[in-house]
UniProtKB/Swiss-Prot annotation:
This is DnaJ homolog subfamily B member 8. PROSITE patterns: DNAJ_1, DNAJ_2. GO terms for cellular component: cytosol; nucleus. The keyword Chaperone applies. The antiaggregation activity resides in the serine-rich region and the C-terminus. GO terms for biological process: chaperone-mediated protein folding; negative regulation of inclusion body assembly. Pfam families: DnaJ. The keyword Mitochondrion does not apply. SUPFAM superfamilies: Chaperone J-domain. Residues 3-69 form the J domain. Efficient suppressor of aggregation and toxicity of disease-associated polyglutamine proteins. Interacts with histone deacetylases HDAC4, HDAC6, and SIRT2, HDAC activity is required for antiaggregation. GO terms for molecular function: Hsp70 protein binding; protein folding chaperone; unfolded protein binding.
Length: 227
């Protein structure tokens, strides 16, 4: 069986934050949805990464793993697993997709246009992955990845887009992303801001500097009209 530290590409002395960063990077790289032409290998790698993260991110499981030795860990280990270990043959690991969703706060990171979508004819922005090819796993936990772009929209109108993403130190609960897009529509300056934080999506639309609509998780909020 593979050494879980080697699977995540970290040292046996890696900190919990190192484990999170490694999982974030590899899970995004090997998620089956990102590898449609190599799905079988991707599923295998994704499962390995998930199992490694499940064990090494839990201090108790990691301690048992370190004491038992990676070569005697679970998956048919039977008698090779120490009697004191709660993990025997056929240990029920969690569904890799459940771990992935939980890590990203219930959000689908591949749905964000700025994640790694290049410019298209509609003026969508380069993704953060394009700016930082190594992926989020290389980021310090407190660091923001910023990208700002300008392009021409249809009909010669201008459009600018700004996006940012940041991760706190607690994995999913520390995730926040902001995407702001401004374009001219019929002579009016329309700015749309999309904020995703702690599993909640908020979309604000401004027209010539005045807030026109607010939508939270797909439901439009009533706006107060000042007389």
């Amino acid at each position: 069986m593979a050494n879980y530290y080697e699977v995540l590409g970290v040292q046996s002395s890696a900190s919990p934050e190192d484990i999170k960063k490694a999982y974030r990077k590899l899970a995004l790289r090997w998620h089956p949805d990102k590898n449609p032409d190599n799905k079988e290998e991707a599923e295998k790698k994704f499962k390995q990464v998930s199992e490694a993260y499940e064990v090494l991110s839990d201090s108790k499981k990691r301690s048992v793993y370190d004491r038992a030795g990676c070569d005697r860990w679970r998956a048919g280990g039977g008698a090779n697993v120490p009697h004191s270990s709660p993990f025997g043959a056929g240990y029920p690991f969690r569904n890799p997709e459940d771990i992935f969703r939980e890590f990203f706060g219930g959000l689908d990171p591949f749905s964000f246009e700025f994640w790694d979508t290049p410019f298209s004819g509609r003026g969508r922005p380069h993704g953060l992955h394009r700016v930082f090819p190594s992926g989020f796993g290389e980021f310090p936990a407190f660091m923001e990845a910023l990208s700002s772009f300008n392009t021409l929209g249809h009909g010669g109108g201008s459009r600018s887009t700004f996006s940012s993403a940041s991760f706190g130190g607690s994995g999913s609960s520390g995730f926040k992303s902001v995407m702001s897009s401004t374009e001219m529509v019929n002579g009016r300056k329309v700015t749309t801001k999309r904020i995703i934080e702690n599993g909640q999506e908020r979309v604000e639309v401004e027209e010539d500097g005045q807030l026109r609509s607010v939508t939270v998780n797909g439901k439009e909020k009533l706006m107060r009209v000042d007389k």
